[in-house]
């Protein structure tokens, strides 16, 4: 299979900008966002800024996996454009049924086009960077077997997302932590540093007090992961906190020998 005939498929939780999607010829299936006034398609008719505005107004939008119809539509488009194979890198199965949906449809299409579906065990830019690196590898001529058997599993195993939240309210409402923990954490200004566990579930790996300590801890943990590696892809993003994101980015640029760093704010990029 010629590398240029390999299609990349992901979902909207990869948080890739329209420019990145277009330049890398990536096919994206939107997750569904359930709001008080109806259902929306993530990245199509609702965006990060809209969701954060609703949260500030007291609403709690719910996410749902992409519809079967939208996933099938993307696969039909890939086939119509003449691709010989599909690599799908989806949102962590620990958070969503998107990966399992893609696997089911891949099985149904096995006689039409080969599809390898990967559980990113991550989300947002952790997932997105894996997709972008796979796109670069395809452009550089990496073949199907090398990509699917070695490269992408290695990328997934060596992706380390870290993030924090300013309030524990939404983790509590989403069932990620208990109400008592949320109340105590709020009173003490405790901010968890969260990552993805080996099974793709969210996991708290540190707790600090105050927003400034959050930024320092995020930088320290990122530096530890980078270690002495000569090349790594590094991205920063924010959920309605662009000023804090920029501070983290600046700190990382001071302390890390960065090959690639992308400042992407889902709350502002439509």
Residue ranges and their predicted role:
Residues 2-7, 13-27, 32, 38, ...:
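Mixed-charge interfacial surface used for oligomerization/domain docking
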Residues 39-88, 92-110:
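Class I S-adenosyl-L-methionine
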């Amino acid at each position: 299979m010629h590398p240029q005939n390999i299609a990349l498929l992901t979902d909207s939780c990869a948080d890739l900008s329209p420019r990145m999607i277009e330049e890398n010829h990536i096919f994206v299936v939107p997750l569904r966002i359930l709001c008080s006034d109806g259902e929306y398609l993530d990245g199509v008719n609702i965006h990060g800024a809209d969701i954060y505005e609703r949260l500030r107004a007291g609403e709690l939008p719910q996410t749902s996996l992409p519809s079967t119809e939208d996933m099938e539509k993307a696969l039909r488009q890939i086939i119509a454009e003449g691709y010989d194979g599909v690599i799908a890198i989806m949102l962590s199965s620990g958070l969503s049924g998107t990966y399992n949906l893609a696997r089911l449809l891949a099985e149904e299409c096995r006689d039409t086009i080969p599809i390898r579906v990967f559980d990113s065990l991550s989300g947002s830019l952790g997932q997105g960077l894996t997709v972008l690196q796979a796109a670069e590898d395809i452009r550089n001529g990496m073949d199907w077997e090398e990509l699917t058997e070695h490269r992408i599993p290695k990328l997934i195993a060596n992706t380390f997302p870290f993030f924090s939240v300013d309030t524990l309210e939404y983790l509590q409402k989403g069932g990620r932590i208990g109400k008592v923990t949320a109340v105590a954490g709020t009173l003490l200004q405790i901010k968890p540093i969260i990552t993805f566990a080996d099974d793709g579930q969210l996991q708290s790996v540190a707790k600090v007090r105050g927003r400034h300590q959050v930024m320092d801890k995020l930088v320290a943990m990122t530096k530890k992961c980078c270690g002495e590696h000569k090349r790594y892809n590094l991205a920063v993003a924010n959920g309605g906190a662009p000023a804090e994101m920029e501070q983290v980015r600046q700190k990382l640029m001071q302390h890390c020998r960065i090959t690639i760093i992308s400042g992407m704010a889902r709350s502002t990029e439509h």
